[in-house]
Amino acid sequence: GRDLCPSCATRRMVDVSAHMVDQVLPRVQHRQWVLSMPKRVRWHLRHKPEVISGLLTVFLRAVETTIRQRSPGAPPDAHFGAVAFVYRFGSYLNSHVHFHVLVTDGVFSAGPDGEAIFHPALDLERKDFEAVQAKLRHRGLRWLHRHGFERLARYCARRPAAGRRCWCGSTNASRSGARSAA
């Protein structure tokens, strides 16, 4: 396939990045979040697309709730922007489904004339990341249980599978004045 050639994969990555910056992403601060799941969950992610969409939705809602709470002046119906990339392999081409998500570092609300108003989030603190992890763990286990994966949910609820599997990059200033993920 096209992604087995390093030159082709690099060119495609550069093209997608340029398109995202030029055409899709608003000129606001962004942060990259990476989510990896316990190994037992990865098999289900690989073979059952509904698990990918379900757990990614749970993750995005947990992040959005935390960012909204950290955005002063944001109304309760404000939303963030996010672009998720599902990676299916690790760096050694091992099967390893995980998510890289680019998220606005704040939320948007509708102004009086319908224009989008950006409410930047305050700097996230360790407790904010821990809150996302706690929400993800609780809601993710509940999602698995509700969708017929009770045994898997019980396995994931015990240590060490219940450990930290979420990473969030810091924000840095970019050439355009917007902040991007590190």
Residues covered by each model-derived region:
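Beta->alpha loop/short-helix hinge microenvironment recognizer with preference
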Residues: 1-182
